[in-house]
C-alpha cells in the first residue's frame, strides 16, 4: 500500500491507497514543531480504528509547501513504517513539462494539480484550488504546465477583515441565500462568498481567453464543494486532486516509465 502525505500551510493530510482506491484520509493542523513520534502516536491510532495495517504500507510519498516540516515527516516514515519516502521535488520524473520563467519557484502542490488533472481528465485544463491561497493552474493542449494565477484564500480574507475592522465578527464562510444582506453577518457572508465567486469566474474567463482551446475547469481543495455550487463554470469537482497527483507521481517513480498521451487520458464523462 501507498501512504501519501500532503503538507500544506494550514493542514497536513495523510491518505492510504491500496492500488485501487483510497482507504482513508486523516487531517492534522500544520505545526512546524511536531515530531515524528507525535505523528506516529496520532496516525497509527487512527489506522487501528479503521483497520489499516501499517505493516502493509510499502511505499510513501511526501509533497509539501512547508519545507521545515519535511524532516520529521521523513523520519516518521523511516522509523515508524520502515519506508524511505519519495519527496515531490525536482529530482523525480514528473512527466510534465513546465513552461514558467523559474520552475524552482513553482509549488509542488500546483504542479501536482496540473499532473493529476491532465492524467485524469485530459488537456487543456484549468485547476482552481481553494486552499490557504486560491490558485489557478493551467495546462495547455500539449499537456504542458504553463502557469496560472494566485489569489489570497477565502479564510485569509476573513482573518484580515476581522483584524482590520475590530467591530466586524470573525465568521465562517457559507453560501448566503441573498446577495443583499440586511445585517452585518449576512452582508459579510455575501461579500465573501459572492465576491470570491466573482473573482473565480473573472479569472477563469480571462485565462480561458488566453488559451489555445476551451479548457476543462476543475475545482479542488477543501472549499471546492462549496464554491463549485456557486458558479456553472466548473466541469469537474475533484476535492482530492493533489492526493491523486502524489499517487500518480509515486507510481511513475516506482513502477515502469509512463509517458503522456491524450488518448490515455480520461475525458469528462468517460
Swiss-Prot record:
InterPro entries according to UniProt: ATPase_NBD (IPR043129), Type_III_PanK (IPR004619)
Lineage of source species: Bacteria, Pseudomonadati, Pseudomonadota, Alphaproteobacteria, Acetobacterales
Record-linked NCBIfam families: baf, PRK13318.1-2, PRK13321.1
Protein name: Type III pantothenate kinase
Top EC category: transferase
Alphabetically ordered keywords of this record: ATP-binding, Coenzyme A biosynthesis, Cytoplasm, Kinase, Metal-binding, Nucleotide-binding, Potassium, Transferase
Native species: Gluconobacter oxydans (strain 621H)
Pathway(s) annotated for this protein in UniProt: Cofactor biosynthesis; coenzyme A biosynthesis; CoA from (R)-pantothenate: step 1/5
Gene responsible for this protein: coaX
GO terms of biological process kind: coenzyme A biosynthetic process
UniProt similarity note: Belongs to the type III pantothenate kinase family.
Amino acid at each position: 500500500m501507498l501512504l501519501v502525505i500532503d503538507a500544506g500551510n494550514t493542514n497536513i493530510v495523510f491518505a492510504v491507497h491500496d492500488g485501487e482506491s483510497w482507504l482513508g484520509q486523516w487531517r492534522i493542523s500544520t505545526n512546524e514543531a511536531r515530531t515524528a513520534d507525535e505523528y506516529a502516536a496520532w496516525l497509527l491510532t487512527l489506522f487501528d480504528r479503521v483497520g489499516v495495517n501499517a505493516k502493509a504500507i510499502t511505499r510513501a510519498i511526501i509533497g509539501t509547501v512547508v519545507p521545515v516540516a519535511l524532516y520529521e515527516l521523513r523520519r516518521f516514515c523511516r522509523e515508524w513504517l520502515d519506508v524511505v519516502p519519495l519527496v515531490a521535488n525536482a529530482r523525480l520524473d514528473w512527466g510534465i513539462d513546465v513552461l514558467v520563467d523559474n520552475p524552482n519557484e513553482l509549488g509542488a502542490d500546483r504542479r501536482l494539480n496540473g499532473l493529476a488533472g491532465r492524467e485524469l481528465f485530459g488537456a487543456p485544463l484549468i485547476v482552481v484550488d481553494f486552499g490557504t491561497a486560491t490558485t489557478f493552474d493551467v495546462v495547455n493542449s500539449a499537456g504542458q504546465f504553463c502557469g496560472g494565477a494566485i489569489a489570497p484564500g477565502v479564510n485569509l480574507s476573513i482573518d484580515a477583515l476581522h483584524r482590520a475592522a475590530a467591530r466586524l465578527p470573525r465568521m465562517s464562510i457559507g453560501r448566503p441565500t441573498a446577495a443583499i444582506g440586511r445585517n452585518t453577518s449576512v452582508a459579510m457572508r455575501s461579500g465573501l462568498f459572492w465576491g470570491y465567486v466573482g473573482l473565480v469566474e473573472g479569472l477563469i474567463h480571462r485565462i480561458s481567453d488566453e488559451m489555445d482551446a476551451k479548457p476543462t475547469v476543475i475545482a479542488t481543495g477543501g472549499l471546492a464543494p462549496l464554491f463549485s455550487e456557486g458558479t456553472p463554470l466548473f466541469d469537474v469537482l475533484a476535492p482530492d486532486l493533489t492526493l491523486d497527483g502524489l499517487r500518480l507521481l509515486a507510481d511513475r517513480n516506482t513502477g515502469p516509465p509512463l509517458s503522456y498521451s491524450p488518448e490515455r487520458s480520461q475525458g469528462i464523462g468517460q
